[in-house]
Design a protein with these regions (language model features):
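Conserved PLP-enzyme active-site core in the AAT-like
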Residues: 1-290, 296-305, 309-325, 329-349
Length: 349
């Protein structure tokens, strides 16, 4: 039986060139800033996203937390989208470690509105927390992999900067957004004061993310990384794979997007689920289960056929395409899911 891994693009495996680069990596001690491969990766990442410097961190969650801690002070409030990864999937780390309260704003598609952000910025009243940061997410995971375009990002950053707020961009999948929009990634990162992006999702590196911004910001973030236990020694072994990810795997993200669209189209008309084609902008497909089908039953039916999907939100299942999912895998998934749900519908009659 086929096995099709659609739970997340974090399941990507390193490429052969990554494994060779890791084995041959020139290394030093990165806490002393003397690992030449880490330094090359940091220079490359900063140049690619149009920032002065960047920092290699073990995970995107740590990168986001380093940014929050660097931009804010205890007692501040950060404006976030209600379903953003920073707010929903990072264990309240900003509050726990940094004393930073999150102010979530609801949106239909993950795209904050500038007027909405303007209203959320606190007045300078002694009773209020100080609004200290605006966080954006591009692509937006829980809203289906939707993209912020440059105009939208600039408008949001303008509102924040006018009020003296820095802007942090959680760009875990920012290269997916750039490829989907047909843009240089710097057009999407330019308005933000800092940006985090992952190497270990669609770009297929085994470990790591990058946090980029001005030199002074990155130096302060380096201290936060050390405090959080993220200072690594001979990290060039990992950074070597990151260099391969950025030089070899960006353009091929278009294949993942095409496969996601193929999957979404194939699931149109399948009973008991609804897929919004308009939300399939990058490499994610969200299927909404229609009663009496539950997401748990959908996941189980898929697993019986070797297809692994993610029980995401209430009544919702997420499917994510990536380098290790082929067009043949998509065809199999469409056929198997369709047959399973049609049989389920007949059994319920």
């Amino acid at each position: 039986m086929a096995t099709v891994e659609l739970r997340s693009d974090t399941f990507t495996l390193p490429t052969d060139s990554m494994r060779r680069a890791m084995a041959a990596a020139e290394v030093g001690d990165d806490v002393w800033e003397e690992d030449p491969t880490v330094n090359r990766l940091q220079d490359l990442a900063a140049e690619m996203v149009g920032k002065e410097a960047s920092l290699f961190v073990p995970s995107g969650s740590m990168g986001n937390l380093c940014a929050v801690l660097t931009h804010t002070r205890p007692g501040d409030e950060a404006i976030v989208e209600v379903d953003s990864h920073i707010y929903t999937h990072e264990v309240a780390s900003g509050a726990l470690v940094g004393g930073v309260q999150m102010r979530p704003l609801d949106t239909p598609d993950g795209r904050l509105d500038p007027a909405q952000v303007g209203v959320a910025i606190r007045e300078p009243d002694i009773h209020n927390p100080r609004t200290g940061l605006l966080c954006l997410e591009n692509t937006h995971n829980l809203k289906g992999g939707t993209c912020l375009n440059p105009r939208q990002t600039e408008a949001l950053a303008e509102v924040a900067h006018r009020a003296g707020l820095p802007v942090h961009l959680d760009g875990a999948r920012i290269f997916n957004a750039a490829v989907a929009l047909g843009l240089d990634v710097r057009e999407l990162t330019r308005p933000a004061d800092s940006v985090m992006f992952c190497l270990s999702k669609g770009l297929s590196a085994p470990v790591g993310s990058m946090l980029a911004g001005p030199h002074a910001f990155v130096e302060r973030a380096r201290r936060m990384r050390k405090m959080l236990g993220g200072g690594m020694r001979q990290a060039g072994v990992l950074a070597a794979a990151g260099i391969c990810a950025l030089t070899e795997n960006v353009d091929r993200l278009a294949d993942d997007h095409a496969n996601a669209l193929e999957l979404a189209r194939g699931l149109q008309g399948v009973p008991a689920i609804a897929v919004d084609l308009g939300r399939v902008e990058t490499n994610m497909v969200y299927a909404h289960c229609l009663p009496p089908l539950t997401r748990e039953r959908f996941v189980a039916l898929c697993l019986e056929r070797g297809i692994k999907v993610d029980a995401s939100g209430p009544g919702t299942v997420r499917m994510v395409t990536h380098r290790n999912v082929s067009r043949q895998d998509i065809a199999y998934a469409v056929k198997a899911i369709g047959e399973a749900l049609r049989a389920e519908a007949l059994a319920a009659v």
